[in-house]
Amino acid sequence: MKAKKQETAATMKDVALKAKVSTATVSRALMNPDKVSQATRNRVEKAAREVGYLPQPMGRNVKRNESRTILVIVPDICDPFFSEIIRGIEVTAANHGYLVLIGDCAHQNQQEKTFIDLIITKQIDGMLLLGSRLPFDASIEEQRNLPPMVMANEFAPELELPTVHIDNLTAAFDAVNYLYEQGHKRIGCIAGPEEMPLCHYRLQGYVQALRRCGIMVDPQYIARGDFTFEAGSKAMQQLLDLPQPPTAVFCHSDVMALGALSQAKRQGLKVPEDLSIIGFDNIDLTQFCDPPLTTIAQPRYEIGREAMLLLLDQMQGQHVGSGSRLMDCELIIRGSTRALP
């Protein structure tokens, strides 16, 4: 009886034989792709996939069949909102022996191939999405074998993923209703990008609160931005240029609210004496601006932690159903809002 042949991991030489190039060319194509032609690079990458070669040290633990690596896809790494979510993810991952890689979707076109390579060569065990979009076209055949995925912060039902987030509609409703209770009836909204689901829900909360309070929704009182300081500043100026500018403004993010606050001051307005402003997220800067910003506090660290725990359950073979896991949020009253006299 013949002994069963022991399986061995594919080597760079196997890739070279399959691609009909030298091992030096394989090394350059995989480690320094700019040093070879696109055709050679494609041939080597195809051969690597076919023979199952995984470059070291990012290769998988053969014995345990895992890389102990998680990929976190962030819409914009420069947005301070994501720092605490990432921290919650990293601390939880480290406690379970996992390394976290960060992928920045703000430069998606340049990074898309990198994300795909990590997935198709099985160099990551799971993915956490902090936005509503996959950083690649999942319809392409070679990308169908995706690792376990969990979404945090956003909610996109079409992706059918387990999701950890707050009730954005109710949070926005409560913020706008608070402004109404302070006597404000001309309430503006600085909204985020229309294509983002969370912005849709926050805008719905704004609209529903106005209607509940018997206030007609005026489209002129809604200005849009892209979650940057500059966008908040520009949107605030748009609202201030109206014949009857708002006496209070609800912003979809703290970053835009801080930009709006700065612009209001540049125009000679006093906050909150002349204008009340509410943000969303409770990033650290909101406590130290002048005046400190009233905002919706999200449990960002806990969102990251819970999302990572769900992903760990998935990777360990447990069934994790799709749909929302809602976290609590809170309206934090600070110095940027006041009751009208």
UniProtKB/Swiss-Prot annotation:
Q: Which UniProt keywords apply?
A: DNA-binding, Repressor, Transcription, Transcription regulation
Entry GO terms, CC? cytosol
Q: Name one GO molecular function term.
A: DNA binding
Please state every residue range assigned to the domain named HTH lacI-type.
10-64
Known CDD domains for this protein? HTH_LacI (cd01392), PBP1_LacI-like (cd06284)
Q: Some GO term, biological process aspect, for this entry: which one?
A: regulation of DNA-templated transcription
Q: Name one Pfam family in it.
A: LacI
Binding region for DNA: 12-31
| InterPro entries, per the entry | HTH_LacI, LacI/GalR-like_sensor, Lambda_DNA-bd_dom_sf, Peripla_BP_I
Classify the source by domain of life. Answer: Bacteria
Q: Which NCBIfam families match?
A: PRK11041.1
Q: What task does this protein carry out? A: This protein negatively controls the transcription initiation of genes such as deoCABD, udp, and cdd encoding catabolizing enzymes and nupC, nupG, and tsx encoding transporting and pore-forming proteins. Binds cytidine and adenosine as effectors.
Mind telling me what this protein is named? HTH-type transcriptional repressor CytR
Q: Which organism is it from?
A: Escherichia coli (strain K12)
